[in-house]
Amino acid sequence: MNTTTTKTIFLGLLLSAGTFAVKAQELPKVFGRTVKSVNPVSGKIRCATAEYEEYLSEKDPNRVSRAAFEQWLAPKVEEAKTKRLAARSTNATAAVRIIPVVVHVIHNGDALGTKENITDAQVLSQITVLNQDYRKMANTPGWNDNPVGADLEIEFRMAKVDPSGNATNGIHRVQMSRATWSNETAIDGTLKPATSWDPTRYFNIWVVDFGDSSDLLGYAQFPSTSGLGGMNTDEGAANTDGVVIGYKYFGSYDIYPQGNYDPDGIYRYGRTATHEIGHCLGLLHVCGDDYTCTLGTNDSRKDYCPDTPATNDYNYGCTPTDSCPNRTGADMIENYMDYTDDQCMNIFTQNQKDRVNAVLTNSIRRASLLTSTVWQDTASVGEIAALNGITLYPNPATSVVNISVQGNELPDAYVVYNSIGQTVAQAKVSSNANLAVNTSALNNGVYFIKIDKGSQSKTLKFVKN
């Protein structure tokens, strides 16, 4: 037998045996739930988003189920796909969407550049990786020549304006007087509410020390449905929205080798953030978290993306595999939404792009990020003060909801969105008379008013009865 073949078969058997051994053991828990999979060699938990979503659903009865989310999203994905194909047929160039980012570096007083208090350069190396991956940049690790590979046409920019209107570099260092955050529920209960920036204007990333006893790399919060017919909205999760990543897995050794990375080396190239932000934009693991090769209509029960081949488990390492040999195509181990090593990953697909586009168009907190201007020049103090004093009354409203301002500073304009992100009213504001918003023709339900002042905006929720 060929020596190379023998080694390959032996390695495959070894990895399979390792996977079996780990599954046979008692798997670790996060958020009070047994994790679905760990790396069979290192024991690391690649992602805890599925477990986190179960935790959020238990904590908040208004948070919709995955099935309800998919039912809400499915027609919007088809609409996004139709638009993409129409644009391709006319060679139309899509506008690149900008997502403003704030990175909260959570530390315990360690000197800058020591342990969890990572340097600005390590943070910025991660932003570079995100842009390489989400833009499928040529001559970078984010490039691929797969026919279904997609440029998601999303760029991440560090915020230049903080919530008070002051200039910032988008890196928010916070001394929380706590060595580690191995208790994940403390992150939701204490850390996030104390540090989160307005999630309608900033994409929040928390970089923390999970502690030596934790093998967790990171996790994310799925997008809001922004309301479903006959169901309550789950906007209550706003102050926890974003991604949380262990500092050892944030940034790129390729770009900034001086950073503080995990010594085993396989997760030090920035793909944990690429993966977790994919979840925030609506993407699922390519295996669908269900361990089967059974596919339904439109790849249902899996990741809802037909152009990612059927996969019945999470893949680790970089070994090519075909876990569903009776289905078309081998496992797409290079997909950012699998569990493989960072250096194996290089692709989002066209159908994954459709899904992301649907979320960015229809999920209110995701859609509002695209209109945020905090990545541009610093706003005036007057603009910030005018927005900070704005409230709505009465709420709930019947025939009118009033925009209440402090002082004589009026906003410039407002837009009213329904619970699925559609514009139902808008107006420029030139006098106090424009601050009374007529709601008599609106159906009962949840609505959002985005109020603009100069380069800034503020989004408020109201209920029509």
Which sequence ranges carry the predicted segments?
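Metzincin-family zinc-dependent endopeptidase catalytic domain
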Residues: T128-N315
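Propeptide-to-catalytic entry region of secreted or membrane-anchored zinc metalloproteases
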Residues: Q25-R201, V208-D209
